[in-house]
Design a protein with these regions (language model features):
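N-terminal "mature-domain start" segment
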Residues: 33-105, 142-155, 199, 203-204, ...
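Sec-exported extracytoplasmic/periplasmic mature domains
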Residues: 72, 122-125, 135-138, 205-212
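A short acidic-to-branched-hydrophobic micro-motif
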Residues: 95-134
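Structural recognition of the beta-strand scaffold that forms the well-ordered cores
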Residues: 115-117, 178, 185-189
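Signature of long, low-cysteine stretches enriched in small and polar/charged residues
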Residues: 145-174
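Surface-exposed amphipathic alpha-helical segments
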Residues: 183, 187-212
Length: 212
């Protein structure tokens, strides 16, 4: 009797243990919390634009195709050190180039000239070069007229334009534009009896675009 009760008790314990094991095995495991993956975008550092022109002064010069068709090419040449002033050399002048175009109208007295000069300096001297040239232009009075600043599109890094009557004869006018871009300084003049302000603006913008 005692053995039978012990047997039943042991059997009951085994059944309970088996059920507990089955319940434990069948219960789902607790899922580990998901950790978000953070991706870092690469930092893009813009390449700074060069402050030095990548083309030679001769390649910045205007071409005949840039000028109205009634002009002819008169002269184009490199500039040499003796052709520039001592002050220009003191400012570190390195090289230069100039080109001249002429136009003759229906009469011998109707003549107009476009001249461009390109000069290369150390980039750290460009502000000084521009300031000195601007002062020289603004103070360039003649017995007949004084230069005065005129509205003009911004060309390059710094630019300014002047208009002046050269002689007592009506119609003789000189426009002068100076500008800097990178380490290049340019002066463009249009002088004569058939000057054209709008044409000058187009020419100056083309000249500025040639400095790369």
């Amino acid at each position: 009797m005692i053995y039978r009760m012990q047997y039943r008790t042991a059997a009951l314990v085994m059944v309970i243990f088996a059920l507990a094991c089955a319940a434990g095995c069948s219960s789902p495991e607790t899922a580990a919390p998901s950790v978000p993956i953070i991706t870092t975008e690469p930092t893009i550092i813009p390449t700074p634009e060069s402050t030095l022109a990548t083309v030679q002064a001769a390649d910045m010069a205007l071409q005949l195709t840039d000028i109205p068709p009634d002009y002819i090419l008169r002269e184009r040449s490199v500039m040499t050190s003796p052709e520039v002033t001592q002050l220009t050399r003191d400012l570190g002048w390195r090289q230069g180039y100039f080109v001249t175009f002429d136009r003759t109208g229906r009469s011998r007295n109707d003549q107009t000239r476009i001249r461009q000069s390109v000069n290369i300096f150390p980039v750290e001297n460009m502000n000084k070069v521009f300031t000195l040239e601007k002062v020289a232009l603004s103070e360039g009075e003649t017995p007949f007229s004084s230069p005065y600043e005129i509205p003009f599109p911004t060309i390059g890094d710094q630019s300014i334009a002047y208009r002046m009557t050269n002689t007592p004869d009506e119609g003789q006018v000189t426009y002068t534009v100076i500008f800097t871009k990178k380490n290049a300084f340019e002066r463009i003049t249009m002088a004569g009896t058939s000057t054209d302000y709008e044409t000058l603006k187009d020419i100056a913008e083309m000249a500025g675009a040639k400095i790369l």
